[in-house]
Amino acid sequence: MNTIRFTALSVLLSFGIFLEANNSGLISMSKNYSADSCMVYNPDITLIQNKDINVEADLLSFDENNAVSLKNNVLIDFPGGSLSSSEALISENKNLIQFEKDTKLSLENFFLQGQKGSFIRSSNNIEIQDGSIFLPFRGLKVNFSQLNGSLDNDLNFKDAIISSCMNPSDGWLIGANEVGLNNETYRGYAKNITLKIKGISVFKAPYMPFATTNERLSGFLEPTLSSSSDGVDFSVPYFAILSDHSDITLALRNIAERGSGIELNYRYIKEHTKNNIDAFYFNSDKKMQKNFPEQTNSRWAYKIQDSLMLNNSSGMNWGEIVINWGEASDAMVLRDIPGEITSVGMQRDHYLNQNVKIHSSFKNFQISLEHQGYQTLNPLLTNGYKKSPSINVNFSKRINSVNIKHKLNITNFEANNLHEFFGASSSMGKYLAIIEDPIEGRRTYSDLTFSKQFIKNIFNIDASIGLKSLSYDLNSHKLANNNIHSPNAIINVSSIFLKNNKNGFSSIQPRLLIGFSQYKDQAGNPVFDSDLVSYNNQVFENNRFSGMDRISDEANHSIGFAYKVNKYNRDVLKFTFAKKYTHSDNKVYLSNPNMVNPHKKKFIMSSMWMPNMNNSLKIYGGFDNKDDKLHIGGINFLTKSSLGTLGVAKRYRRMAGNFRQTLNYSEIYTSINIRDGFKIIGKFQHDNEYDVKIQSMIGLEYENCCIALRIIGSDKNLTRYNDLYNSSYTYINDAWDNMINIENKSRINFEFELKGFSASVNKLDRMLQDSLLNY
């Protein structure tokens, strides 16, 4: 082959020197099944610093207009791109390039192929027949019979085939009579389309819009489709960008057995502000009206989550306003209508928060003002107490080597009505369904502490003394409450022994805690927000109660140690053991003296083994020597390999919740890689105490680099209420026994994703949120 290199062509046309380029291998294939695109663009664009172009060809000639004709093995390099072809013609001003046969045009953001056409460099106008274009931003390839337009704005295609698959017959393709792309708005449309998957036509439409970039764009999102015990559930979401900092998603939704409604998600994010609003509204609910004819109202729910940093003009932060407020039309709406694009709450949530908090810091002070309330999602229970307002003032200062801390809380408690709960039952095991005139009033709590830390030989010693105070100002109740002041003291002694090993270290940390808190009679004081601290959190604490309605009486000591092995800056083994000895019987209780914690010798242990990032085992438990019973325990086992993932979890608590019920749950989760992108996913939760299924989920997923298909079936046992508004029961226990049974709620979700063309929200993430492996 006689290759002519025009190193002297600058005398005639100022083309400059030749730079070798290579058009082979510009598009490579991704072999990862979960990749976002099958094709990866590797542009080989010669970096030319001026406006000249460089050419190479077997044959060269000039016509009467001084245009350069090139034939055989043509290669043209120019600023921002390169072109290879069998034949090409370059105009005298080097602006127009015409080409024929086996042409490849490589640009920074596009790769084009074709049999005949032209390209104007100054305007990026292009015409091609029988070719293709690759859009690297989405990994899309468009074959066409004819293309014309400008690469800077509008492109028009005739007889187009769109796909992100190297072999569309094994994946997906969309055939269209006409396709338009706008490279300024990054939007496109297709007319008279046919969608084929694995060569089978599955969908036809006269018109379909789509995006040509991964950036945020307004427009319709992929519809969602599922089938449940409430019939077919179908929604069409629309996403709109309101500004650089905000967007909104609206979805029209229809549930066959319930009716039509709308969902909304609004987001606003800026440097000092984060706002999220989720809401849905159904004007009526056919199934609700059938089961409860007296209820004909609309059903809705919303949740507002907002945070605003309070900054002055100089940028100094004065504090923050935080809002977490949710409300629902009725207690059962989230159970009956789970969100599709919204996250107001989950089907098993017990309440919605209704909180507003303002807090600030000034030198040694932290101050907050708060409203805290709830809406119950259990129709048998009331909304409980509201804290409005609740004022917190925290002071901390170090004087010489002494740390001084003072916490002051003043809270007003209000309630229209109240149900009884643990610590406030009328008789053993019986809880009033309604207290029409509950105790209300203001509570003042103070905690003053002086502490000092010092090192004695190999021991770290933290010693503190303090005074806790509690007083009440109750409204219209002649309750013999006691204003109390209780001194307390804590000595915490610890040490650490290190041994350096190859690639890491091991350590042992022994610990001793001695605690004392003087007994004060609090039998007449109300219980607004307190409960027993969970068993495993009592060992190294000098308090048995959460909240501020009780000051615990304590005379105890706890001993324990923690052993740890660290390799490559990662903990591979942990083991902790602790035991608490109570030296005298506790006399402070909530409201029932029979519920005083009897455990005088309790111990807890926990361990974690994680030899590598793919395998882990975690175990914890709490045991009492006096009754020889396990009070709390849990196991997590997780392993990953090329075959898939397996997780096993177990949770046990002897007394949990307001009614002190035994919780005994287990779960198995698995994700099995079958072959060539196929995967089976399953999750099964079981209540071992009552031997009933809680929830099961199984799904089949196929994914390769251009398509993802998922079919997910879920099955839940949820509480069903025979009469939502029956108030004839005196005790919650009786209402629970007579009004509640179990209802099975099943659902099948269908998901698909045409990679590069569409995007699908993987609902598996939401379905796995309540996995025991997360707790």
Label the model's feature ranges.
Residues 17, 250, 358, 393, ...:
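A residue-level signal for conserved active-site and pocket-lining positions in enzyme catalytic cores
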Residues 2-23:
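Classical Sec-dependent N-terminal signal peptides that target proteins to the secretory pathway
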Residues 236-240, 325, 347, 354-360, ...:
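Outer-membrane beta-barrel transmembrane strands
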Residues 8, 19, 299, 351, ...:
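Short, solvent-exposed loop/turn segments at the edges of secondary structure
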Residues 165-167, 344-346, 379-381, 450, ...:
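Catalytic micro-motifs at enzyme active sites that drive phosphoryl/nucleotidyl and oxygen chemistry
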Residues 115, 125-127, 148, 154, ...:
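Outer-membrane beta-barrel translocator/pore domains, especially the C-terminal barrels
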Residues 184-209, 214-220, 318-320, 364, ...:
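Carboxylate/His-rich catalytic cores and anion/metal-binding grooves
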Residues 22-354, 656-659, 675-682, 688-692, ...:
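Structural signature for solvent-exposed beta-strand/loop edge elements and short helix-capping sites
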